[in-house]
Amino acid sequence: MSSSSSSSTSMIDLMAAIIKGEPVIVSDPANASAYESVAAELSSMLIENRQFAMIVTTSIAVLIGCIVMLVWRRSGSGNSKRVEPLKPLVIKPREEEIDDGRKKVTIFFGTQTGTAEGFAKALGEEAKARYEKTRFKIVDLDDYAADDDEYEEKLKKEDVAFFFLATYGDGEPTDNAARFYKWFTEGNDRGEWLKNLKYGVFGLGNRQYEHFNKVAKVVDDILVEQGAQRLVQVGLGDDDQCIEDDFTAWREALWPELDTILREEGDTAVATPYTAAVLEYRVSIHDSEDAKFNDINMANGNGYTVFDAQHPYKANVAVKRELHTPESDRSCIHLEFDIAGSGLTYETGDHVGVLCDNLSETVDEALRLLDMSPDTYFSLHAEKEDGTPISSSLPPPFPPCNLRTALTRYACLLSSPKKSALVALAAHASDPTEAERLKHLASPAGKDEYSKWVVESQRSLLEVMAEFPSAKPPLGVFFAGVAPRLQPRFYSISSSPKIAETRIHVTCALVYEKMPTGRIHKGVCSTWMKNAVPYEKSENCSSAPIFVRQSNFKLPSDSKVPIIMIGPGTGLAPFRGFLQERLALVESGVELGPSVLFFGCRNRRMDFIYEEELQRFVESGALAELSVAFSREGPTKEYVQHKMMDKASDIWNMISQGAYLYVCGDAKGMARDVHRSLHTIAQEQGSMDSTKAEGFVKNLQTSGRYLRDVW
């Protein structure tokens, strides 16, 4: 017992050091095994000291992590060049807000692809240079508060705040802004509680979509209603043109307003002209031993209980088949990801995010343009060697890997380059003529030329680099300031867990288009799916990191409620999941309400996808009626909205009985036409004027009976 007591005391001393945030340092890596016995003793202590259970469990994980890093450092200390030294492990307490008497500005962002975050950080960087006595903080909206009460408690303490808010899909907030947006838009009874807040909003959207910058507009309106003082008109960034120019114009309008708030009284000094630095990571080159460690780390990368974009599940492709007939000159793929035993789950109507690799031909072209070895193994660092941050604008670096892997997994190479990328290329162009041309394209004077030569021509980053061959940015610049991060592609899941619990089905049309420059654009993810090898064909099957994003595109909780589904082409995907779920209900004896599916394709002989399945759904009673529009069979083109008008009376009767309406597919064309048809049906069948009909349709949306999954 005395021995046990002594041992317990030493454990508590060790725990105290960890809790206080004091470094835990192993001076001799050879003694790493001793820490394994320490971990074992800690485990046994759990039984005797249950009050320390939570702390001890966490500490074991920390200690084991320390051991692994120490062993790796020791084994890789041969000929590595500029390998980062292992820093002492310090557990930091939660950062507390410190009132140092300085004025404070908070810059929030809600981003899906990183653009809003980039603009927020760019504003913060320049503002810090202009107003040195002010404290600026960049905040992810999802990290700002743990719950609704904390949102309100913290926001009412803000004096100056800026919101960078992207809108995507059917006028929806981004994933990291969804919780804030729901709370903020539902709080209509707060009164003018934000009278002390001065603010600005910059939105990111695409004018081709119906709900252009809806999220930014809604937040701006509510801020005014609740007493906040608008410093500058809401910025409406349009990604269909040059959103960087929109941001620049909004930012320039902001500075005079900020001067009146943040400049000290009597300070007449003119702000020093600010030039944004070209973003650059610090780069370390490693040897093969370091590469071996990272390969082991990546191989065990699925040990997560919660899967998201940062922690996806690497799923094998179980099934792949072509849905178009050989007569079709296009392609549509049915793909099934195997999630058996992973812990990854989904619900009918959810989306799956797929992180696909760039094509090898694309990567080869990038390697040629960079003129570097594909086997160069490196790591990126967002801080200097002394640990201080290089720039708050740098995105988190990806894990160490070789150059081919980095270009394959992480670099977006086929999108049109932003102006900031052209500036970065200009800084590393050895030919002065090329450097000046790149600078001109990125300048206000070159706005029209950039719009025509880059945006309208849809020139890819690699095409632009090929036009300026002397521009050879180093790795730190290329991955920080030239090539944006490759983003996941989202697909409506085309299955139901009631039928396919261990599979996620995807229905994907191949993207294969000729660009204005003559380049053939091959969609990154759709081409990967087209070329995927399923394990039903080979043990050496294809796999991809995936994760599930929840959706509100759900069937009514009451199965007897009528449903109207409208989805041409791959817009059929979520409705296939709906019908699988209804089939499972039918087979279990559940009574279903009326249902109709409006589907559209070009020709029955070419692209009537899932035709046999749809007929079986009708025969089983899972689907009451199937109405198909063929746009290329008759003398005139017929689309789903025409079929809707043919069934206007039936649709109105179903709506009158409480039906839910669902639309999935193209937001720019089809969804708008369907919306207009619905408006017309309400007018004609409901004997309403145009204003009342629009109000009726809007009420269907706000009450959750008119749902859209559009892109």
Swiss-Prot record:
Q: Where do transmembrane segments lie in this chain?
A: 52-72
Stated induction or repression of this protein's expression? By wounding and transition from dark to light.
Q: Which UniProt keywords apply?
A: Endoplasmic reticulum, FAD, Flavoprotein, FMN, Membrane, NADP, Oxidoreductase, Phenylpropanoid metabolism, Transmembrane, Transmembrane helix
Which loops or segments lie on the Cytoplasmic side of the membrane, by the record?
A: 73-711
The GO annotation for biological process reads: phenylpropanoid metabolic process
Its placement in the membrane is given as:
Single-pass membrane protein
- Which positions fall inside the Flavodoxin-like domain? 105-255
This chain's source organism reads: Arabidopsis thaliana (Mouse-ear cress)
- Residues annotated as binding FAD are R489, F490, Y491, S492, T507, C508, A509, G523, V524, C525, S526, W711
Q: Which residues bind NADP(+)?
A: R330, T570, S631, R632, K637, E638, Y639, V640, Q641, D673
Task: State what protein this is by name.
Answer: NADPH--cytochrome P450 reductase 2
Q: Note how many cofactor molecules are bound and how.
A: Binds 1 FAD per monomer. Binds 1 FMN per monomer.
Endoplasmic reticulum recorded as keyword:
yes
Q: Where in the cell is it found?
A: Endoplasmic reticulum membrane
Q: Which reaction does it catalyse?
A: 2 oxidized [cytochrome P450] + NADPH = 2 reduced [cytochrome P450] + NADP(+) + H(+)
Q: What is its main location?
A: endoplasmic reticulum
- GO: which molecular function terms? flavin adenine dinucleotide binding; FMN binding; NADP binding; NADPH-hemoprotein reductase activity
